[in-house]
Amino acid sequence: QFVRGFWPFCASVFVLMLLSDGFRPALFVAIRGYSKPENRTRAVTLLRLAINLGFSLGPAIGGLIITHVSYEGLFWVDGISCFAAAGLMLVALVPKRSTAEEKAQAALAKGSPYRDRPYLFLLFSSILITIPFLQYFSTVPVFYSEVHRLSEFSIGLLLGANGLLIFLLEMPLIKYCEIKGFSRFSVLRFSVLLFALSFVVLNLFPVHAFLWAGIVLMTMGEMLNFPFMNRLALDRSDRGQPGAYMALFTISWSVAHIFGHTLGLNLIAHFGFTITWWCFTCMLAIGAGMLYLVERNMAREHAGTQKA
């Protein structure tokens, strides 16, 4: 609100993003501390629902405030809402006292995420999977507009279906997977297959109806992938400092954001949409291969621990 000039504005955005990105690992660590181990996946899913709800309501509320008040009013409401959230956390989240067993486990868990090879492979696979996923919010809308000549309203309906499906189906879907006892890596591999199929549909079926099939496949993959990927990272953080582990996991998302949008737009500019979608399908296949390596490494570790 009070910043004037390009570079001061850049500095203020940097500070804002630094604080917000520092908040995300703390959220994951809080889930680890306040939820039971068997409920971690659903706890992450509930957190994702809250974030998606904020993303859905935020632009609409912000637009109303800008229209009827001003940008300054938006900044004041935004700041006050952050203070309100902090106050709610202070009141509602009672500091949890560690038990003697938890303190003993924390004393033994001195692992570093930078020396945890399976975890680093997991992060790399996460980047390879997230980059294609992000295309649905950057380059795929361009594809809708330029190739299929969809209006902004139609594009908004397609993207809005993503949020609606997540709101209605994600929690029941995760609960179903847990009841059936599907392994996490099986669910992750299936989710990557759904991501890949969403791009294959865009290439092989250039019909408007199949754009809906693509967004449904992508959304189903998203609902299955990210809760279980977060759960794997949370469980792995038991080996060391949870904050360091989850901060590195958050960084992997930031890396995907940094390179994903630019990579997609440049591929389209040089090779067109069809080759770009095949490239991202291949990237997803590599990501699935990395997940297989992670699963093998973790299984080998588990077998070695049992022998010891």
Where are these regions (language model features)?
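C-terminal ends and interior cores of transmembrane alpha-helices
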Residues: 1-4, 193-206
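Hydrophobic core of transmembrane alpha-helices in multi-pass small-molecule transporters
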Residues: 8-22, 210-224
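Cytoplasmic helix-loop-helix junction between adjacent transmembrane helices
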Residues: 14-51
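Short amphipathic helix-loop junctions that connect adjacent transmembrane helices
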Residues: 138-154
